[in-house]
Amino acid sequence: GVVLDLRNNPGGLLDQAIKVSDAFLNRGEIVSTRSRKVDDAQRFNAKKGDLAEKLPIIVLINGGSASASEIVAGALQDHRRAIILGTQSFGKGSVQTIIPLSGHGAIRLTTAHYYTPSGRSIQAKGITPDIEVKQAKLETIEQGRLRREADLRGALKNPNAPKKKGAEGDKSSDKEGAKAKEKPFDYQLDRALGLIRGISLYNARVSN
């Protein structure tokens, strides 16, 4: 399967969003731009050919996914080509045009809006994920130093135990805990990979 991570992707050029969407679609509309004038509407369609060859696709989005990344997510979602996982996207669906002014100035105007294949406007709404998964922050629970037999008052000492064994053991445990804290854990990505494995396993059993 394929996991397409569009989280914190602020977007880019429209033609690149169309190419990325087209890579996973065989046919149909990818996105349309509509302005006040009906005649100025533009529609962009996919060409035949699926890069993933019907493999399951998960698209990750969050509040930092905007503009071109929302076009990709919206197109794959409307065509039911991918499952969108994460949180609501940013909602930047406006087409802005720079118009030169006399002299050395220019003005940027919003001239149209982006619409997904099903006719949804992205502007100020964004893409709603099929499966909402918020990023979880996992932390190690600090339990302090655990009490052992050797910590009890009047406990018998081990005659064969090296000196300061307990202190060295504590330092070792502290180092292991520090290493565990350093390892980042991406909960949303982990959920996406688990979902990909589940879908792939199911499809394999059905085909057999």
Language model: regions and residue ranges:
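C-terminal "post-core" interaction segments
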Residues: G1-N208
